[in-house]
């Protein structure tokens, strides 16, 4: 089989393929290639004399000198010395060569005969030597070096086989015709001189697993002699062509037939136990062809190629090979350790130190992160490029910030940037007629019609990937909308056209005949005669002109309304650039609201409105224009014209998707306006009353235009916020608009859902409506901290108004009990307790629908959908209801509410004010004496009363300038404690009736402990009456009771009771002052005074004998109307006692 030419390219190609050799084998191959390439310096004087011949020719193989027989086995010394001399000769200078000729056909290679029997473990390899012949001697130029060799004693070749190796038939030729020279193979670095047939040495190694044959360029280098062949051969220059064989072992052989020695360099492996048999080399010379077999030892392990060294340095070479492998292993270990450390460091940078990933996953994550950084860097470069281009346009800093901050103009700006960048970075064509070619510096290719890259292999520039990948995100022309100044200017123009009516003037001026038409003048040489006026004027124009003018005016108004409401409204399509900016700022506003950063939340909401194409006014002119436009728009929407046109915002075509997007855009803008209005009302957003009014009207108009996209609760809340703004910002003369907006909210709820949201049901109640419209209250910027209700959402003003209304209900209920209507003939006198229970029931419903403390700060949520329970207000309502039920002697209803009052809410427990604890202990004392569980009567109830009295005194001492509701609660608790102590004293009275003949001294007095406690509570009541005048009525009654308990003089007691029995008014102008200093007693106080006077005063203080029974009967009738069954029961018991002793008294 023909062998390919031997070159370095073939070697590199073979080395590039996968193999089982390790890095040491590749290193040795590179070292050997370096030795081969540097053959000039390694073997100086190879072709110097005395080996150089005449230079023109050599010994002809066909001459008689070369055909004489001779011995084939010269002495070994001669052969060895001849080979050394041949290898040490210098290289001759190259001579000009002729052009190359066609390559000769080499002779076939035949295996050797099996006469040689190698030992075990040794394989036999045949090395046939074939002489390549060519007809004409034409060497290659620059590739072959002519050599000349000396002609020693010519040995004779024998045609008979040597050493039992028969000559294969027709296989070898040993000579060439006279005068012919041989041409070496092209590509060989070393060639025979002209006239000398080159001999190629073919080595074939058989192995168990066939490997790829590696061939390298051979240099005349030889290892120490391992095999010596003694033969008597002819002096024939032999082309040494050793072959590197990639197999289980590697062999490099070189032979030279110079009549002296033949050297075979075998590269033995470093593996211990590898032996090479050094015996006589079986050689067959037949017709000038040398066939040699070399026994080799093939090892199954990997065998590195050793450096060529002398035979005497074999131990040192083996030692260096071991040191080299050790060093190589250390290098590999350091290399792998460095790789592992860098991979671990890369993992820590990309995914963190806690993650557990393999090397492949770490590299994959790193690649993804690098791509993300590249994409981010590209976006930043694009933004930087856009900013630089905007700066080059000589824009001011304000315009630049506004252009970059507005989401709607970002894409338009980038389009202009892209065009300018392409024009800047793309050089012009060389001439006008040449086609446009994309420059390598250009960011995008315009040569392609599709806008892609100029070539198929080059991708588009990543600067404009976003604009190419998402072309649908560019905002359309109608989505930008009109500014409020433009809207107001258009409205002003329409108003001027309708008021001045320029169309009528214009058409009327054209319709009237001109003077040249009415009067004609005839010129003649003599006289000028005036023509007569034409009386046949166009009468039809007078009737047709007004309808045409009004038709044109109506068309102008219609076109203006369409421009304002249909094509002037900004519509933000989903997944567009402005929509992305809007939701980004809105989500950030939600986060800022949750953190309590209200100023930053207001800034984010402002940017969100800019993204929607609805920027807030920044100057006074813009604010005035925006406010006037919103007023005009609200009036038009009340006429249903504006609302019908706004429902078709974006276009008059029947596009359902566009209408849905327009409604959603209006809803989002309305919610943002509403939240900004709430922040402004709570003092979290800067601006005056005009700014707040503008925000309220904008939210209301857009919410009405959104239609079904806005929930009923949200729409009602926006109406209530507008009513709140009217009451807060507008003068009192315009407060009637509050009723209008509240009515609109109620109608909106009832028309769509049929029910009012729970958080706004109190607005539909007459009491709540009256409180909202006529109440004297104001919204504070800080949450209202109170003991009687919890604060709601701090950014919702309606939650604060609801909290104020709950406290108002509690105060009204307390006033019904402690200070009812003083008019004796009032129709409401018998409804004091029922009115109080009605207020408390409304308070409970408001407490159940109040905003929970864990409110939601989302812009889309509202108090209308977020409900909770106010436990504090509910506890106070339950306490007041329990006391009222005890006074009405409705013990079953009181017991149902007692479990709610027994446990004080956590907020009141953590409070430092003693008033809640005083209320709790007062309830416990009243329950022990007035309730069903009367087992704790006596000393235990007195102990509870003492605790309650102590907390009440602390409350009066710590809060001298308390609010009206605090004073009402303190009066309620103080009166309750005095009633409990009075009931305890009455229970200790004997059951016998009080005869009229007995004096007060005969009645049992209260103990010192009871009197001391009663005086303590009475002093608290006097202290409260100094700042709260309605408490003075109770002071007179309880002071008379204290004198009765102590058995004091009845004269002073009668005077105190007389203040409650007689209703005196001041004379004339002093009546108001007297009424202010001494409040008129209520009907309950009058009945209580009658009961005390008839029961405990001596008979001498009564005017008639039957007056006691009459007083008791009158007191019973009054208490029955009031519904105080407790005192009514005591009065009836006294009447029964007096009925048995009437005869004694009258007699």
Swiss-Prot record:
<dbReference type="GO" id="GO:0000981">
    <property type="term" value="F:DNA-binding transcription factor activity, RNA polymerase II-specific"/>
</dbReference>
<keyword id="KW-0968">Cytoplasmic vesicle</keyword>
<feature type="site" description="Cleavage; by MBTPS2">
    <location>
        <begin position="490"/>
        <end position="491"/>
    </location>
</feature>
<dbReference type="GO" id="GO:0090209">
    <property type="term" value="P:negative regulation of triglyceride metabolic process"/>
</dbReference>
<dbReference type="GO" id="GO:1901524">
    <property type="term" value="P:regulation of mitophagy"/>
</dbReference>
<feature type="region of interest" description="Transcriptional activation (acidic)">
    <location>
        <begin position="1"/>
        <end position="60"/>
    </location>
</feature>
<dbReference type="GO" id="GO:0045444">
    <property type="term" value="P:fat cell differentiation"/>
</dbReference>
<feature type="modified residue" description="Phosphoserine">
    <location>
        <position position="117"/>
    </location>
</feature>
<dbReference type="GO" id="GO:0019217">
    <property type="term" value="P:regulation of fatty acid metabolic process"/>
</dbReference>
<keyword id="KW-0597">Phosphoprotein</keyword>
<dbReference type="GO" id="GO:0005654">
    <property type="term" value="C:nucleoplasm"/>
</dbReference>
<feature type="modified residue" description="Phosphoserine; by SIK1">
    <location>
        <position position="337"/>
    </location>
</feature>
<dbReference type="GO" id="GO:0009267">
    <property type="term" value="P:cellular response to starvation"/>
</dbReference>
<feature type="compositionally biased region" description="Low complexity">
    <location>
        <begin position="78"/>
        <end position="95"/>
    </location>
</feature>
<dbReference type="GO" id="GO:0032526">
    <property type="term" value="P:response to retinoic acid"/>
</dbReference>
<feature type="compositionally biased region" description="Low complexity">
    <location>
        <begin position="62"/>
        <end position="71"/>
    </location>
</feature>
<dbReference type="GO" id="GO:0051591">
    <property type="term" value="P:response to cAMP"/>
</dbReference>
<keyword id="KW-1133">Transmembrane helix</keyword>
<dbReference type="GO" id="GO:0006695">
    <property type="term" value="P:cholesterol biosynthetic process"/>
</dbReference>
<feature type="modified residue" description="Phosphoserine; by SIK1">
    <location>
        <position position="338"/>
    </location>
</feature>
<dbReference type="GO" id="GO:0044877">
    <property type="term" value="F:protein-containing complex binding"/>
</dbReference>
<feature type="topological domain" description="Cytoplasmic">
    <location>
        <begin position="569"/>
        <end position="1147"/>
    </location>
</feature>
<dbReference type="GO" id="GO:1990837">
    <property type="term" value="F:sequence-specific double-stranded DNA binding"/>
</dbReference>
<dbReference type="GO" id="GO:0000122">
    <property type="term" value="P:negative regulation of transcription by RNA polymerase II"/>
</dbReference>
<dbReference type="GO" id="GO:0030073">
    <property type="term" value="P:insulin secretion"/>
</dbReference>
<dbReference type="GO" id="GO:0007584">
    <property type="term" value="P:response to nutrient"/>
</dbReference>
<feature type="transmembrane region" description="Helical">
    <location>
        <begin position="548"/>
        <end position="568"/>
    </location>
</feature>
<dbReference type="GO" id="GO:0045542">
    <property type="term" value="P:positive regulation of cholesterol biosynthetic process"/>
</dbReference>
<keyword id="KW-0539">Nucleus</keyword>
<dbReference type="Pfam" id="PF00010">
    <property type="entry name" value="HLH"/>
</dbReference>
<dbReference type="GO" id="GO:0010867">
    <property type="term" value="P:positive regulation of triglyceride biosynthetic process"/>
</dbReference>
<dbReference type="GO" id="GO:0009750">
    <property type="term" value="P:response to fructose"/>
</dbReference>
<dbReference type="GO" id="GO:0004879">
    <property type="term" value="F:nuclear receptor activity"/>
</dbReference>
<dbReference type="InterPro" id="IPR036638">
    <property type="entry name" value="HLH_DNA-bd_sf"/>
</dbReference>
<keyword id="KW-0010">Activator</keyword>
<dbReference type="GO" id="GO:0003062">
    <property type="term" value="P:regulation of heart rate by chemical signal"/>
</dbReference>
<dbReference type="InterPro" id="IPR011598">
    <property type="entry name" value="bHLH_dom"/>
</dbReference>
<dbReference type="GO" id="GO:0003682">
    <property type="term" value="F:chromatin binding"/>
</dbReference>
<feature type="compositionally biased region" description="Low complexity">
    <location>
        <begin position="170"/>
        <end position="190"/>
    </location>
</feature>
<keyword id="KW-0225">Disease variant</keyword>
<dbReference type="GO" id="GO:0003677">
    <property type="term" value="F:DNA binding"/>
</dbReference>
<keyword id="KW-1207">Sterol metabolism</keyword>
């Amino acid at each position: 089989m023909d062998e390919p030419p031997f070159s370095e390219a073939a070697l590199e190609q073979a080395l590039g393929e996968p193999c089982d050799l390790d890095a040491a084998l590749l290193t040795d191959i590179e070292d050997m290639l370096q030795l081969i390439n540097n053959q000039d310096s390694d073997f100086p004087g190879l072709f110097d004399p005395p080996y150089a011949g005449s230079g023109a020719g050599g010994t002809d193989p066909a001459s008689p000198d070369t055909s004489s027989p001779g011995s084939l086995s010269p002495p070994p010394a001669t052969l060895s010395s001849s080979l050394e001399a041949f290898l040490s000769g210098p290289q001759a200078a190259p001579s000009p060569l002729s052009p190359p000729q066609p390559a000769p056909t080499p002779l076939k290679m035949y295996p050797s005969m099996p006469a040689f029997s190698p030992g075990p473990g040794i394989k036999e390899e045949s090395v046939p030597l074939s002489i390549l012949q060519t007809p004409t001697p034409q060497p290659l130029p620059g590739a072959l070096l002519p050599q000349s060799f000396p002609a020693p004693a010519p040995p004779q070749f024998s045609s008979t086989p040597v050493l039992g190796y028969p000559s294969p038939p027709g296989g070898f030729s040993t000579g060439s015709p006279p005068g012919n020279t041989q041409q070496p193979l092209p590509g060989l670095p070393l060639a025979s001189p002209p006239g000398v047939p080159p001999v190629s040495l073919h080595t074939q190694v058989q192995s168990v697993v066939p490997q790829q044959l590696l061939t390298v360029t051979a240099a005349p280098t030889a290892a120490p002699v391992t095999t010596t062949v003694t033969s008597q051969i002819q002096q024939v220059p032999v082309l040494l062509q050793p072959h590197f064989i990639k197999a289980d072992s590697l062999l490099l052989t070189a032979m030279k037939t110079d009549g002296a020695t033949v050297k075979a360099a075998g590269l033995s492996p470093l593996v211990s136990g590898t032996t090479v048999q050094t015996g006589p080399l079986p050689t067959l010379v037949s017709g000038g062809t040398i066939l040699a077999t070399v026994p080799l030892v093939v090892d199954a392990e990997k065998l590195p190629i050793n450096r060529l060294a002398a035979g005497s340095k074999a131990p040192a070479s083996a030692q260096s090979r071991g040191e080299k492998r050790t060093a190589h292993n250390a290098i590999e270990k350091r290399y792998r350790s460095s790789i592992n450390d860098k991979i671990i460091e890369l993992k820590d940078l990309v995914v963190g130190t806690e993650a557990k990933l393999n090397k492949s996953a770490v590299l994959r994550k790193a690649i993804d992160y690098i791509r993300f950084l590249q994409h981010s860097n590209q976006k930043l470069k694009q933004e930087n490029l856009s900013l630089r281009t905007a700066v080059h346009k000589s824009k001011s800093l304000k315009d630049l910030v506004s252009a970059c901050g507005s989401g709607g103009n970002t894409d338009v700006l980038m389009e202009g940037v892209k065009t300018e960048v392409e024009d800047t970075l793309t050089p012009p064509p060389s001439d006008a007629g040449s086609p446009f070619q994309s420059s390598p510096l250009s960011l995008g290719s315009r040569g392609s019609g599709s806008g892609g890259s100029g070539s198929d292999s080059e991708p588009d520039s990543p600067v404009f990937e976003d604009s190419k990948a998402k072309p649908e995100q560019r905002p359309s022309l109608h989505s930008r909308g009109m500014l409020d100044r433009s809207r107001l200017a258009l409205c002003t123009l329409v108003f001027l056209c309708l008021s001045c009516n320029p169309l009528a003037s214009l058409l009327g001026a054209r319709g009237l005949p001109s003077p040249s038409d009415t009067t004609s003048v005839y010129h003649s040489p003599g006289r000028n005669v005036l023509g007569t006026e034409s009386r046949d004027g166009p009468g039809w124009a007078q009737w047709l002109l007004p309808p045409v003018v009004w038709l044109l005016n109506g068309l102008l108004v219609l076109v203006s309304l369409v421009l304002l409401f249909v094509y002037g409204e900004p519509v933000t399509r989903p997944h567009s650039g402005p929509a992305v900016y809007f939701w980004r700022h809105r989500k950030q506003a939600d986060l800022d609201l949750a953190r309590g950063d209200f100023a930053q939340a207001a800034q984010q909401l402002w940017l969100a409105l800019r993204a929607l194409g609805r920027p807030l006014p920044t100057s006074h002119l813009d604010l005035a224009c925006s406010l006037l436009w919103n007023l005009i728009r609200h009036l038009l929407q009340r006429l249903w014209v504006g609302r019908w046109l706004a429902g078709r915002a974006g276009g008059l075509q029947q596009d359902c998707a566009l209408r849905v997007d327009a409604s959603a855009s209006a809803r989002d803008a309305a919610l943002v306006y509403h939240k900004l209005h709430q922040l402004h009302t709570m003092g979290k957003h800067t601006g005056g009353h005009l700014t707040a009014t503008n925000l309220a009207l904008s939210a209301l108009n857009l919410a009405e235009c959104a239609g079904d996209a806005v929930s009923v609760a949200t729409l009602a809340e926006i109406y209530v916020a507008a009513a709140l703004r009217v009451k807060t910002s507008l003068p009192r003369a315009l407060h009637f608009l509050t009723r209008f907006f509240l009515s609109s909210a109620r109608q909106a709820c009832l028309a769509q859902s049929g029910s009012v949201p729970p958080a706004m049901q109190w607005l539909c109640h007459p009491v709540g409506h009256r409180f909202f419209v006529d109440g004297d209250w104001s919204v504070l910027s800080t949450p209202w901290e109170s003991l009687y209700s919890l604060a709601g959402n701090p950014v919702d003003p309606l939650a604060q108004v609801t909290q104020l209304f709950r406290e108002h209900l509690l105060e009204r209920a307390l006033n019904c009990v402690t200070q009812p209507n003083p008019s004796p003939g009032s129709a409401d006198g018998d409804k004091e307790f029922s009115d109080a229970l009605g207020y408390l029931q409304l308070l409970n419903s408001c407490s159940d629908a109040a905003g929970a403390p864990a409110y939601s700060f989302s812009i889309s949520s509202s108090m209308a959908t977020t409900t909770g329970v106010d436990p504090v207000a509910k506890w106070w309502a339950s306490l007041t209801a329990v006391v009222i039920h005890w006074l009405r002697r409705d013990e079953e209803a009181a017991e149902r509410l007692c479990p709610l009052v027994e446990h004080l809410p956590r907020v009141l427990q953590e409070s430092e004010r003693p008033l809640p604890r005083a209320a709790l202990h007062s309830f416990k004392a009243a329950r022990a004496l007035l309730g069903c569980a009367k087992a704790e009567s006596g000393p235990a109830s007195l102990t509870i009363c003492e605790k309650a009295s102590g907390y009440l005194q602390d409350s009066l001492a710590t809060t001298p300038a308390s609010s009206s509701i605090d004073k009402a609660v303190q009066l309620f608790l103080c009166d309750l404690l005095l009633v409990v102590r009075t009931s305890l004293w009455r229970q200790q009275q004997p059951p016998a009736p009080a005869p009229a003949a007995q004096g007060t001294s005969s009645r049992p007095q209260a103990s010192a402990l009871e009197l001391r406690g009663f005086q303590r509570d009475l002093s608290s009541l006097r202290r409260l009456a100094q700042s709260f005048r309605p408490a003075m009525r109770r002071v007179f009654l309880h002071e008379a009771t204290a004198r009765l308990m102590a058995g004091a003089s009845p004269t002073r007691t009668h005077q105190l009771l007389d203040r409650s029995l007689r209703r005196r008014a001041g004379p004339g102008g002093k009546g108001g002052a007297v009424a202010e200093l001494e409040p008129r007693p209520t009907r309950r106080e009058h009945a209580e005074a009658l009961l005390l006077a008839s029961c405990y005063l001596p008979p001498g203080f009564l005017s008639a004998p039957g007056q006691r029974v009459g007083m008791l009967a009158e007191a019973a009738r009054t208490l029955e109307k009031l519904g105080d069954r407790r005192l009514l029961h005591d009065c009836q018991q006294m009447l029964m006692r007096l009925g048995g002793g009437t005869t004694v008294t009258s007699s």
